């Protein structure tokens, strides 16, 4: 097994009487797509906030690239790209200004790749960020998260609420990043069909606890019913007892 990009050991986080993460342990080696799946409130975003160094571990430990993200934020964040569902970009900037602004923080910024992504995502350079649709903002956020070719890309529900075409664009960019450059992606979502399309490894989290964490093919093989291989949706129901999302939700 290759060196772990993320190493989490017995991580626990409580907010008052609520246990958001309960002795969570994960090891993510380099060069694959990891799907982190669970319902809203399951602990996905809290886990990601620890990885980003936004929360300090109350118990247990978090290491990213072998570093403590709280103690060494520059050493971690300079090698990490991040896109969230909120995608809070400065609305007063134009797209080209957003690119130039972000570029200044990353010596490894790849101008040619940024231009390629801009064309792929059909983003008008002179357009104000505030005038972009939700889907266009997601593409702009993904562009600036990818263009410096981070070793680790963390996506927290990046396509929630977006139309299928935009989701396909985002997933396509993830696949290219991994397939072409051998980088690592941690992809958080409650859309299990989406995760099945791109993930090599899947971690299911429920009520702050890890239910299962393994290669997707191993998870599906271990949940075979006769000759039929269950989908992730069906596996989640088998593990938890209720669907992740109600039909049509």
Placement of each model-derived feature along the sequence:
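Conserved beta-strand-loop-alpha-helix hinge in the C-terminal portion
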Residues: 209-233
């Amino acid at each position: 097994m290759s060196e772990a990009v993320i190493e989490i050991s017995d991580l626990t986080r409580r907010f008052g009487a609520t246990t958001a993460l309960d002795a969570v342990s994960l090891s993510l080696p380099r060069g694959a797509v990891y799907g982190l799946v669970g319902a809203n409130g399951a602990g996905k975003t809290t886990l990601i906030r620890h990885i980003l160094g936004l929360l300090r571990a109350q118990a247990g430990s978090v290491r990213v690239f072998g570093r403590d993200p709280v103690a060494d934020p520059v050493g971690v964040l300079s090698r990490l790209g991040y896109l969230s569902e909120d995608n809070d970009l400065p609305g007063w900037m134009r797209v080209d200004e957003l690119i130039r602004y972000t570029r200044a923080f990353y010596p490894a910024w790849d101008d040619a790749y940024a231009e390629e992504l801009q064309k792929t995502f059909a983003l008008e350079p002179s357009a104000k960020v505030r005038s972009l649709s939700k889907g266009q903002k997601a593409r702009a956020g993904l562009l600036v998260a990818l263009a410096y070719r981070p070793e680790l890309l963390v996506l927290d529900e990046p396509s929630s609420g977006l139309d299928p075409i935009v989701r396909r664009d985002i997933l396509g960019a993830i696949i290219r990043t991994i397939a072409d450059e051998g980088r690592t992606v941690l992809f958080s979502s409650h859309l299990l069909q989406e995760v099945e399309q791109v993930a090599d490894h899947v971690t299911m989290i429920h009520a702050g606890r890890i239910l299962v964490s393994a290669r997707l093919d191993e998870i599906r093989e271990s949940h075979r019913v006769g000759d039929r291989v269950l989908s992730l949706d069906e596996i989640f129901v088998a593990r938890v007892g209720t669907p992740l999302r109600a039909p049509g939700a």
